Structures are given as structure tokens and as C-alpha cells.
Design a protein with these regions (language model features):
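N-terminal secretory signal peptides and thylakoid transit peptides that target proteins
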Residues: 1-15
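M16/insulysin-pitrilysin zinc metalloprotease superfamily fold
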Residues: 86-90, 121-152, 303-304, 327-385
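Short pre-active-site segment immediately N-terminal to the catalytic Zn-binding motif
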Residues: 66-72
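Active-site SXXK
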Residues: 74-88
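Non-catalytic beta-strand/loop surface segments
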Residues: 23-66, 90-126, 162-216, 240-287, ...
Length: 448
């Protein structure tokens, strides 16, 4: 199960270089056809019925992610995601695969800082068995030492492949730690090898007991089903799952303000060309500036016509690749711009131009054409997501996790379309120009 990074540097889809259209009236997007209720044990249920759909998407969103890793156990939430595919008291290992793949469906999972999500898509007439399986692993997961050792090995190899073997793996892994000094967002989702090796079966059982409970989960079902049938099946399978009487631990770290700009240097083996980055701390996804920051990010690096790509790659030939991301999570966020140098370009020069072009957004707001194009990119991406039951369910899930409100998925589209050039300039001044930043230079050398 891959670590899905709806996170740093991937938030704004750089491939969405859509043609500029003539200005048009704001789109009127129908709201999600949502029904919701809560079981007595605390499970939140969200139904998105679609009579025209032949499939259903079943998603369980647990409010536990990498920020909740126990002390000395970085990467544990992601490791646990893998373990959830092992057996339960009444369900052999790989049953989820049989219930999905054997009927032409699919399943997967992902872990990020704020949440762990298990999602499956099957033909609509196979919905109830999948609900039973999700309730079963919520209530009765059983993991033995062999399963823990096997999945730990898988995750360690994933870390080696994604971070150690990739020439720029250490570079991208370092960026969250530059934004935060004390908040657990500074840790990577995959964790550290030593911490993964230290995990025990007692850790597994305690983690499941603490976080994998109905009052810490949202069940989202979208597609072709009758809501009355869904309600009956959910009550049948999830209703008996007991919620512990203990409180759920929550991260309550207050990040101290950054007083000055900083510069860091990181060396790693097998780095073909230097890379540089600028990282700022940012507000969380529920902040009033979130939509304008998304637009600003897309203006800077949302495709080949974006400002950073035009200035650093196409016109000056200083970089082979550039990016900028607004990673706005539940508690706080990061803004990060990066560039990989073209051959012979000194990192210091590249860093200076990256900073100048990024901060130019605070002095030169977007033109009407720039703004219309970027709003079209972002709105189109959101509308494409809503074309499938799984996409609608995921949009709702992110609204719950990041903003605490399922209906925020609809408001987000209106907020994007309402962003003005003045809004973009204002947030660039507040969150980039006037904010403290950390500059990173990444070069070939022995790791420090």
C-alpha cells in the first residue's frame, strides 16, 4: 500500500497546463448529494448515493496519521496500515483482496500526516460483504510476530527505495523538518529504519486499541446503492463494534514562531546535480487564506506556462525542474519552492533567482488571463475528481479531515473561483515576503 502524498510539492498538479479560455461566469457546481448520520458507538456515516452508478466506493477514514506516531516509533501509523491487511478473528489474511479483486474491483490504502484511509471499489451488488470486512478488521484485528516482521521488512525496503536509493529522496524528505521545529509534522510518514525495527507486537495492539475505533472513524460510501439498505447493513456490521471509554490522544503542540531566516546545507551520495529549496511555515487548510494560497502555488508552478518554470527553466535555463507546493494540513501547513540545477549552474545563483521569482508575486499580482487560467486548472481538477464515486467520496473525506466539515468540499470550489489578483498579492506578501523562511542547498557528498 503506497504512501499517498497529498502533500508537499504534489498539492498543485503541475501537469494541468490547460489552454486559456475566455473569461466566463463562475461555474455553478451541484453540491454533493450527501446524507449522514452517527451510530451510538460514535461512527460517522456519510452516504453519497448515485442511482446511475454501477459501482460503489467504500472508504474508511481513521483520524490517525504520521503525526500520531508514538514516541520513538516514527513511521508506525504507516506500518500499521500494512498490518490491517492481515487476518482477524473471523477473516483470513487477504480476504479484502478476495472480496474486491475477485469480483472485478480494487482496494488500497494510504497514510499521510493527519489520516489513514482504506478504500475499495466493487460492483454495487457486492457492497455488504465489504462493509462486514471493514467492521471486522476495525473490531478484531489479529497480528502475529511473523506478520509484523514481514510488513516491517516491506516498509523498510520502501524507505530504502523512496528515500535512500533516489538521488533526491533525502532532499524531499528534509523539507517538512525545515518548516517545523517541534510539531510532529516535521517527521516523514515512512519513518526511520531504527524506529521501525524497534516496533513490537505490544505497540501494534496498543495502537489499534487507541485509534482504530468507531468514534475515531468516518465511513464514506458512494455510488449505486439504496440508502435504507446501507443504513441497515452499517448497523448490522458496525453497530456491535464497541467504542472504548478512554479518550483519544490528540496532538496539541504549539509551534513557536520563527524569529529569523535560516540557511541549511545537506549532502548525500549520488546527487547528479545540486538542488535548492525555500520553505515557509503556513496556516492550516481551514484558514481563510487557503484558497488564495492554492492559487498562488499554481501560478508559481502549475504547469509549463507557470512563472517559475518560465523564468528558471524555459527562459534562463538555470534549472532542469522546478516546483512549488502549498501543503495545508489540519494543524498547520508549509509553502515550499524547489529547483534542481541545470548543469554548471551554481546552487547559490539558482537559490537567489528562485527566491526573487517567488517573491515577485508579492510585487506583481497575476494578470486577468493568468488568474483565469489557474482558476480553471484547479476547478477542472476538482470537477474531474467528482466524476466517479471514489472521487466524490475522497473529496468529502478530505473536507472532513482538513476542515472538520463535510460540506466544505462544496464551499472549496466557490472559494477558489472567488480568489482575486489582490488576494494572491496579499497572501504572497503575508506568507512569503514578510514571513521567515529556511533555505536548503542539497549537494553531492557524504551524509552528515
Amino acid at each position: 500500500m503506497p504512501v499517498t502524498r497529498r502533500r508537499l510539492l504534489l498539492v498543485v498538479p503541475a501537469a494541468l497546463a490547460l489552454p486559456t479560455l475566455a473569461p466566463a461566469a463562475a461555474l455553478r457546481v451541484p453540491p454533493l448529494a450527501l446524507q449522514s448520520w452517527r451510530l451510538p458507538n460514535g461512527l460517522q456515516v456519510y452516504a453519497l448515493p448515485d442511482a446511475a452508478a454501477a459501482t460503489v466506493s467504500v472508504q474508511v477514514w481513521y483520524r490517525v496519521g504520521a503525526k500520531d506516531d508514538p514516541p520513538g516509533r516514527s513511521g508506525f501509523a504507516h506500518l500499521f496500515e500494512h498490518l490491517m491487511y492481515k487476518g482477524t478473528r473471523h477473516m483470513p489474511a487477504e480476504t479484502i483482496d478476495r472480496l474486491t479483486e475477485d469480483v472485478g474491483g480494487q482496494n488500497n490504502a494510504f497514510t499521510v500526516d493527519d489520516v489513514t484511509v482504506y478504500h475499495s471499489e466493487v460492483p454495487a451488488n457486492h457492497l455488504e460483504p465489504l462493509l462486514w470486512a471493514e467492521a471486522e478488521r476495525m473490531a478484531h484485528l489479529e497480528v502475529d510476530q511473523a506478520s509484523l516482521d514481514s510488513e516491517r521488512h516491506v516498509v523498510v525496503e520502501e524507505y530504502r527505495e523512496r528515500v535512500l536509493a533516489d538521488p533526491y529522496g533525502r532532499f524531499f524528505e528534509a523539507l517538512p523538518a525545515l518548516a517545523f521545529d517541534v510539531h510532529p509534522y516535521r517527521r516523514g510518514v515512512i519513518g526511520r529504519i531504527d524506529d521501525l525495527r524497534a516496533a513490537t507486537l505490544d505497540d501494534v495492539r496498543a495502537f489499534h486499541r487507541t485509534y482504530y475505533r468507531p468514534d475515531n472513524a468516518a465511513l464514506i460510501v458512494a455510488g449505486g446503492f439504496d440508502v435504507a439498505d446501507l443504513a441497515r447493513w452499517v448497523q448490522r456490521h458496525f453497530g456491535p463494534v464497541e467504542a472504548p471509554g478512554t479518550p483519544i490522544p490528540r496532538v496539541a503542540v504549539v509551534e513557536p514562531p520563527r524569529r529569523r531566516d535560516e540557511a541549511r546545507r545537506l549532502a548525500a551520495p549520488h546527487v547528479p546535480l545540486p538542488a535548492v529549496a525555500l520553505v515557509w511555515r503556513a496556516p492550516g487548510a481551514a484558514h481563510r487564506d487557503a484558497a488564495a494560497l492554492q492559487v498562488a502555488s499554481a501560478l508559481l508552478a502549475g504547469g509549463h506556462s507557470s512563472r517559475l518554470h518560465a523564468a528558471l527553466v524555459r527562459e534562463r535555463h538555470l534549472a532542469n525542474a522546478v516546483g512549488f507546493g502549498a501543503d495545508l494540513r489540519a494543524d498547520a501547513g508549509t509553502l515550499a519552492g524547489w529547483a534542481i540545477a541545470a548543469g554548471g549552474v551554481p546552487p547559490a545563483r539558482l537559490l537567489g533567482v528562485l527566491a526573487a521569482e517567488t517573491l515577485r508575486l508579492a510585487e506583481k499580482p497575476p494578470s486577468a488571463a493568468e488568474l483565469a487560467k489557474v482558476r480553471a486548472q484547479l476547478t477542472t481538477a476538482a470537477l474531474v475528481e467528482r466524476e466517479t464515486p471514489a472521487g466524490r467520496a475522497e473529496a468529502l473525506g478530505w473536507a472532513l479531515v482538513l476542515r472538520g466539515d463535510a460540506h466544505a468540499a462544496d464551499r472549496a470550489l466557490d472559494e477558489l473561483q472567488a480568489v482575486t489578483a489582490a488576494d494572491v498579492q496579499r497572501v504572497a506578501r503575508e506568507h512569503l515576503l514578510r514571513a521567515r523562511r529556511v533555505a536548503l542547498t542539497y549537494v553531492q557528498g557524504a551524509p552528515g
